[in-house]
Amino acid sequence: MSQIHKHAIPANIADRCLINPEQYEAKYQQSINEPDTFWGEQGKILDWITPYKKVKNTSFAPGNVSIKWYEDGTLNLAANCLDRHLQENGDRTAIIWEGDDATQSKHISYRELHRDVCRFANTLLELGIKKGDVVAIYMPMVPEAAVAMLACARIGAVHSVIFGGFSPEAVAGRIIDSSSRLVITADEGVRAGRGIPLKKNVDDALKNPNVNSVEHVVVLKRTGGKVDWHEGRDLWWSDVIEKSSADHQPEEMNAEDPLFILYTSGSTGKPKGVLHTTGGYLVYAATTFKYVFDYHPDDIYWCTADVGWVTGHSYLLYGPLACGATTLMFEGVPNWPTPARMAQVVDKHQVTILYTAPTAIRALMAEGDKAIEGTDRSSLRILGSVGEPINPEAWEWYWKKIGNEKCPVVDTWWQTETGGFMITPLPGATELKAGSATRPFFGVQPALVDNEGHPQEGATEGNLVITDSWPGQARTLFGDHERFEQTYFSTFKNMYFSGDGARRDEDGYYWITGRVDDVLNVSGHRLGTAEIESALVSHPKIAEAAVVGIPHNIKGQAIYAYVTLNHGEDPSPELYTEVRNWVRKEIGPLATPDVLHWTDSLPKTRSGKIMRRILRKIAAGDTSNLGDTSTLADPGVVEKLLEEKQAIAMPS
């Protein structure tokens, strides 16, 4: 970008921060040079039944990828998230639930959550679920989803949470792969005023002849909508939990016992069941939550992610609850029924830390000041961003409009497979640059390598790898360790390959440039699609953009840009020329888009990620096999884009 914005650490943060710049340097050096000492100390953030003596036992060696942390220690995750807080903070609010309908909200104390989790843990045992069994959870954003997850952890069952937006086919595939014995769902979900037929989707999934492991379906009554009922298989949540005792002793788990499976889409083939274990994962989720959000006991914390994604696991539930925090769970969407809904929720609950995604920020940005109308957001002190690289323009808007120019923005880079934050600012220790994830978290050793795996020193760019293990790292892919090794450790030997590219600037700050397959090669020059998208979105009339490469006879690849304009703006030949020149000015002639495709909407998954694979195929005119579109929030978008494409003159 033509300009680097730099933000100093605000005085109000510096005065009471947990980690200042000097402490960051000292702790980071210790975490790299003496990982056993550092993580041995950090492990004390949890209560252990049998204290660990071993800390780190890991290998990234070809043919021998093995990751173990705290392997001789025992603990229980639910006891760390609930029981240990009861004596001093039992009446503290654990979960604030804000419904899709703004008139519905409730506060659940640690004591109440503990009671419900114990009762549901006993329910699971009565249904024959035991330590090591897999339970599929396909729930809306309601407190019972958290109860189900914590109850599984309490008895040692492995949960596999499936995002409530996934299709019956996707649900069936995940149940089959994990051999889930029980499904927990609701009659319906509610989102932006619309019902989501969760129970019907489960019924359809269970009709798949390859689903033969499921014994029962527990159904929460969320809306009271009509559902089909399978006597003997289906059970109402309220019926089973009412009969269960609130007295339950948590199961003693080894640190390396499986905690959950979370499916993430592979670049090829079927989804991968990423497996996380108990001890190292929770140490990492709690430590990263505490330091990255500079958590203080009076904070009200809101992570907007769904429980169906890893962000919902680590930073809506487990990290905050392990630290005894108050976490807000929101059933709705940030811009419904009004563009100011997110800001209204902040004011209503006096939220101090807000963690959301660039896709939400850009949607609000397109609404302009309507996104903050009638709100003051004065309670906020820290903002966070997750899910994809945030373009500097959206970062600045978020900082300025949502945070009133006083809240540091922690732009966190991490993945389902990492369990927690990897590259991220710390509010009291890091000067910020809009669009940069900045520096590695404690114990994280990033490197940039070329395509042959040679490390690149200094200010440079390359493939982002991690050269040594950290406690939150996924241990394997469920039932397929060979694929785990193949996917993450075979491209570059003795290193974990993230699949992302990044550049490092003169200050050692990292800038994520997007997936490596989202890098264009135009006339022999590498261009990150994120960089071009950022330039496009910095245009005052553009709300969102997605850039892909298309084959070009001379340049190798040409640049094809899908562009969504702000409300009230219309495409015109003049604007077409203006936008192309704008990018040329921002980045250089090489980055000038060859094609602008005006469109009202882009194909997105329900978590807000743009499906670039589909955009690449549409742009290239290759519509023979668009692959699985079941995870799209609105599959109709694809048809519309194909129609629009017909009218576009393509470069030769």
Curated annotation (Swiss-Prot):
Domain of life the protein comes from: Bacteria
The protein's required cofactors: Mg(2+)
Record's keyword annotation contains Ligase: yes
GO cellular component: cytosol
Cited PROSITE patterns: AMP_BINDING
Record's keyword annotation contains Nucleotide-binding: yes
Record Pfam families: ACAS_N, AMP-binding, AMP-binding_C
Residues modified to N6-acetyllysine: K609
Keyword field: Acetylation, ATP-binding, Ligase, Magnesium, Metal-binding, Nucleotide-binding
Residues reported in the UniProt entry to bind ATP: G387, E388, P389, D411, T412, W413, W414, Q415, T416, D500, R515, R526
Protein name per UniProt: Acetyl-coenzyme A synthetase
